[in-house]
Amino acid sequence: MDTLTVSHVKKSFGSQEIIRDLSFRVPEHSVFGFIGENGAGKTTTMKMILGLLRMDGGEILVEGEAVCYGQTRTNRYVGYLPDVPEYYGFMTPREYLRLCAEVSGITRKEADKRADELLEMVGLTKADKRIHGFSRGMKQRLGIAQALLGKPKLLICDEPTSALDPLGRKEILDILSAVRESTTVLFSTHILSDVERICDQIALLHHGEIALQGTMDDIHAMHKGVGF
């Protein structure tokens, strides 16, 4: 079963065509890498999946339900980590997750349980200091925990490893690889080694179109000897 289906999607801003007849599928419990240079249309696509931007054509399905601009019905299936997550810096990570859970309608008992589970998963159980003192990598890990609070069917991460050192990137990628047991992951990046490390499938976006798509084994086989 496919958690996400994008079919013939188009998007323009004024006379500039950003997304051109974009189609791809993300199978359940897979890690899907959306790779492309800055400005290729990755973030625009993610915002359309979230219903934050109107499509000019095509259809997007999450768990078989159509995404509609301005409506958040399908977002009950989705957890989202933006490229630069924002926090209340005066809070500890546990306090912050409890607040997010309360806003989402999760009971206090369940919120405490989920916060403990997720902080352990992302390696922040001993991080009792305020969030304003966190490194970029720690903030990204907390962002993943926040995105997973509601047990989403689809986790969307926009450039989660950008501006991180090699160790920080490895920590994030290890987490994303591990969570495929409980959810499906779509993440964007411009770093080829990231998708090679953990992705089941990738789509290379170039000037708003899919230039290359498939499993890593298929792509390596197609481009054997040409340096991919």
Predicted regions and their residues:
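Walker A (P-loop) phosphate-binding loop of ABC-type ATPase nucleotide-binding domains
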Residues: 37-41
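Catalytic Walker B motif of ABC-type/P-loop ATPase nucleotide-binding domains
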Residues: 155-158
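Hydrophobic anchor residue at the start of the ABC signature
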Residues: 144
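ABC transporter nucleotide-binding domain
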Residues: 171-228
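Conserved ABC ATPase "signature" region
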Residues: 98, 102, 110-126
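Conserved ABC transporter NBD signature motif
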Residues: 58-69, 73-74
